[in-house]
């Protein structure tokens, strides 16, 4: 990742801070809700997964897929990389375009293996 990109991200964060407008699932809960943005590693990963799942669908459908990922304890990079593609696709089926999104989630996880969340 280029230093210029990180510099721009840092400037934006310094000036605007965390916006907290994306719903996340709090520990011990089932439904993502607005709570000031992601605070834990798992919540940050959930937001990234959510950005993939919400494409070309409603938030309600994406949220259902996120709930299913949480129920199967799949908000985890290694678990996404190790699960069979068709099983992952079945889990996120409510989000629509589930075969393509399963591939995208695996690609995102490969990227995050190379560039961990704490570096972004």
Regions from the PLM with identified roles:
Residues 1-119:
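N-terminal polyanion-binding entry modules of DNA glycosylases/AP lyases
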